[in-house]
Amino acid sequence: MTMKRCKSCGQSLSNEDRISQLPEALLLQILSLLPTKEVVAVSVLAKRWRFLWKMVPSLEFFYYFTNDLERFSYNVSKCLFSHQAPFLQSLHLNMNFGCDPRIMDFEILIGIAFGRQLRKLVLKVYSGDWFKFPTSLYNSETLETLELYHCILIDVPFPVCLKSLRTLNLHEVEFVNDESVVNLLAGCISLENLVIHQTTDLNVKTFTIAVPSLQRLTVIVEYYEEFSVFVVNTPSLKYLKIEGIIVDDRTCIIENTPELVEASIIDVSFKVFESILGSLASVQRLSLKVSLVEIFSLPPISNTFYHLTYLELSTYKPKWWNLLTLMLDTSPNLQVLKIFDFMTSQEQRPWEKWNEPKNVPECLLLHLETFVWTCYEGKLENEIELAKYILRNARRLKKATFSIIEINPDKRVEMVGELKSVVRASNSCQLVFI
């Protein structure tokens, strides 16, 4: 160990490599946070580090189309062959081809990774053409997480075998046909979490999600081409998020979700909204964002939400209170109600009146304890009367919070005073203004 002496104080200073003294497990964890190219580069810093990079459990590679593709493929293959950890925890390939992605043989690289008992594969492809994911790679004993992004074409002519796969994320990929969807999901017998984020897919007419083991499902759609039906048959599902299915000729059929506990429905068409709402009888927590739902004249709901205790309603449309009234009437055990009012007074129509229910909803009389209104404007009679109605009738209410948008101080004092003057049904109700 080299020793130097400080000129100012005469104390000895050490050039000791303190990082190398860290436990190997911690060093590997630190190295896992770096791109693999940098991990290999730092191996020259100390003798102990020379071979440590070969034990790093996670590898990440970036390719840009201006780089030498042949050299890139060679370096990735070399790293994979040199890998000495008990198994490969994750492999991230971020590829920007700018041209035809078929010029690179992914099958060999990913096949080597599978031979290292790969647990997680993340593949992101940016290209002017679609990259067809190799069918031979749909069979793995160890893969637990598969994330495919962007210009990837999925063609599965036969059922796959991904028996350890628990998380599948499909982001802006495209399927060849309906059968490819069915065959891919049918081979994922342990799948628990599925995320589908589509921006274009002209080939699939019926997107069938039939996975007995699935517990969490997120479907986000951001395109407007023809697309017939989403069919969901997931008897173990506990969480559901549906967003962006806004074209009226599209629908979503939820056939079997008896275990569903939480759901979030965002920006869907009226047809989809009507279809989904009747399938949520078992949910305990529900979030509704109704910016695109036609809620001027909602039909009656046949089922009652006996298990629903938590409701969030985000408002963007005139007459949104019709939906609120409907949900209050059909949720007898509701305990928490949160309103996010993103609609300004300029957007509302003063002639559209809120009609007080003929009978006070059971949830207000017996169960509602928490009421939150975010972005409360208090300018229109409708929202003022609705807020007063809840305060006057919620007998078990413990806390009512109003987040008031920025207004002049005098108007704020007047608004707060008006709500404070309401004779509350609950003597223990605390009013909070923020």
From Swiss-Prot:
SUPFAM superfamilies: F-box domain (SSF81383), RNI-like (SSF52047). Residues 353-403 form the FBD domain. The keyword Repeat applies. It holds the Pfam family FBD. Gene3D superfamilies: 1.20.1280.50, Ribonuclease Inhibitor. SMART domains: FBD. LRR repeats lie at residues 69-95, 100-125, 145-172, 173-198, 219-244, 265-290, 315-341. Keywords: Leucine-rich repeat, Repeat. Residues 16-65 form the F-box domain. This is F-box/FBD/LRR-repeat protein At3g26920. The lineage of its organism: Eukaryota, Viridiplantae, Streptophyta, Embryophyta, Tracheophyta.
